[in-house]
Each structure stands twice: as C-alpha cells, then as structure tokens.
Amino acid sequence: MKNHFEDFIHRRVKKPSSQEVQEILSIFFEKKLDKGAIFKEGYTVIKKLGFLVNGSARTYFTNDKGDEITDEIVQKNNFLSDIISVRTGKKSPIVIEILEQSTVLVANMDRVWDLLDRNVTFNILIREYIGDRAMVLLKRHFMFLNGTAKERYQYILETNPEILQKFPLKYVASMIGVTPTQLSRIRKEK
C-alpha cells in the first residue's frame, strides 16, 4: 500500500530524492479502519497524520444545536488531518470519521514534525497539500458568501459527482448549508 503513497509523492514533488522518499515512507504504518471508525475525536489535539490509500472519510463538527455539520468528504489519495489542530497545537472540534472500509497510512505527529525539520521532499509535499486545501476552502468560502445553495450543489456536481452517488445526501446537504429536504428540492429542479 505504500506504493500508492510513493506514487502520490512522485506526482506532487518534482524529482524527489529517493532517500527522502524512503524516509517519508518509513514514518507511516498501514492501518485498516472499518466504517464508522473515528480517526480523530472532536475537541482533541490531533496526534497523527493519515494518508487515505483507499476508502473514504468525512470531517465534521457538531454545532450548538447538536447537529453534525459535514465539512468535507475525503476520498483516496488524500491526507486525513485537522489543519486547525496541527497548526495551533490546540484542541479543535473537528471529527474525522471513516465512511467505508478504508486503508490508511498513519504517522505519529511527533515523527511528522521531526521529518519536516530535515526533509525537503516532505516539506514540499505538505506545502502542496496545504496550498491545495487553502484553494478549496477559499473557493467554498466565496461560494458561501456569493453563491446560492443551487450553485453550491452545482459545484459539487461538477467537481465531485461521485460524492452524490456514494454517500448519504444528509452529508452533502450539510456541506452546502441546506437541509436534506432543501437538497431534494434543488435536485428535482435539475
């Protein structure tokens, strides 16, 4: 399974040092997680970084009313992380839940920080990941500020149509800021 991660590194980093790639791979161990497993509990400090080899997960938080608000659905070849907790070293409300049988490569954050101090390839890889996350989040932010629920749904339809077929619509509704009933109406209008 580390072959998938190694391929991912080579796609994301131009001419990575093979020694540095091996160092990166060495801090990760493979873990099989069942549907419903929690990779990171809410209101905790993240202790590990994951790379989703196959399967899927979602990040969510619970609002003041007790409703789960899905932030994102993460699919294979992506990192599992809570950037708020990683960046601040503090507790964050984000929960990372596994949505189906998944294989995750896991590294303890102590080893991640240590490797980031000395491995240029890993630095580039993580910088690229954070840059990509920032772009996605900014696009979503602008859509929430300027767009309608219908436009947010259309964006998911265009960028991640498999999400609509594969996962409960309550997650999608939550991601675009509507109720499941409102999402049904939007879908019927299409």
Residue ranges and their predicted role:
Residues M1-F29, S85:
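Cyclic nucleotide-binding regulatory module and flanking cytosolic helices
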Residues E6, R133-F142:
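Short, Lys/Arg-enriched N-terminal segment that forms or immediately precedes the first helix
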Residues F29, S56-F61, F79, T103-V104:
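Short beta-strand segments in beta-sandwich/barrel cores
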Residues D34, V53-N54, Q75, E100:
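A cytosolic small-molecule/anion-sensing beta-strand core signal
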Residues F39-T44:
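Short phosphate-coordinating micro-motif centered on Lys-Gly-acidic
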Residues K47-R58, K76-N77:
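Glycine- and acidic-residue-biased ligand/ion/polar-headgroup-sensing regions
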Residues T70-R127:
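Cyclic-nucleotide recognition modules
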Residues G147-K190:
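Phosphate-/nucleic-acid-contacting segments
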